[in-house]
Amino acid sequence: SSIKKDELEKKWKQNIELNPVFINKKLIFVTADWKVVALNSDDGSLLWELQALYMPSRRGILVENNKKLNLEILYIPIGNRVYKINANNGKRIKEFGKNGSIAAFTLVAPMIYEKKLVVVNMNVNTFDINSGKIIDTIPIHLIKKNFGGGIPWGGVALDSDKGIVYANTGNPHPAIIGINRKGKNKRSASVVAIDLNKRKVLWDFQETAHDLWDFDIPSPPIIHNLKKNKKIYEVVISVTKTGNTIILERNTGRPIFDITYKKAPKSSIPGEITAPFQIDLNKPEKF
């Protein structure tokens, strides 16, 4: 049955700036004034808080339920580091990295793959989950790219069975004006698949070539098994600013539905060379 307005009452309130995580009756989140806070989810009472000196990431906290240590652990990006924190008391786990943190900037939540911590910025970096020692660094972008930016700020996803990270990348910089970054600016405003075991980019699919409109992809990829014409496809799905729902095969990056290309308008700005064509997705229907 539906819930009526008079059946609801305010229980408690806190100001937050990201999706909270819930662990064993603890609600943990980041506040606008750079605090990491843990509340009792039943009554909203404060369990612990950690005041950060630098801005914590607003796009995710990783939770590890470590059964070996019988401990719930948080991995929180703050400033240019990722901190490993005991979820029960808010204290750093000092055996990790340098005094409980590693030098690794990221805008999105880390991930765990085979006892490795995966941290994504302009590279896909892996660290030993216990010591924090760097294991590997896999570049997302080409070495000879002619633009800045392109960091995956909207989110990433991990197919732990395949060992593949999927990243939705940001727009190329300088944004809006592309006179000094001619060409498609490959792997910007794109879905990119990175194989952790093969240590390379498997494929990339660019939604907006030579982006001049801030059309980078703001949402995290979604890993899904899609049924189409009585066949199951392993796909990764990305919802974009332009209203597209990009659905690609996870292994190959091939679109599940046919795509076409439409002619793009030319720029009136001297020296600006726009991409002559942009992809046009007809299915699924645009938002």
Predicted regions located by residue number:
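Residue-level recognition of short loop/turn positions
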Residues: 7, 24, 33, 42-43, ...
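Aromatic (tryptophan-biased) beta-strands that constitute blades/sheets of beta-rich domains
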Residues: 1-15, 45-52, 91-104, 133-144, ...
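Hydrophobic/aromatic beta-strand positions that recur at structurally equivalent sites within the blades
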Residues: 39-40, 64, 85-86, 127, ...
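Phosphate/diphosphate-binding loops
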Residues: 222-268
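Beta-propeller blade signature
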Residues: 79, 85, 123-133, 184-199, ...
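Short, solvent-exposed loop/turn and secondary-structure capping segments
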Residues: 32, 39-41, 86-88, 95, ...
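Repeat-blade elements of multi-bladed beta-propeller folds
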Residues: 13-35, 54-81, 105-124, 148-180, ...
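Secondary-structure transition/capping motifs at alpha-helix termini
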Residues: 44-45, 68-69, 90-93, 130, ...
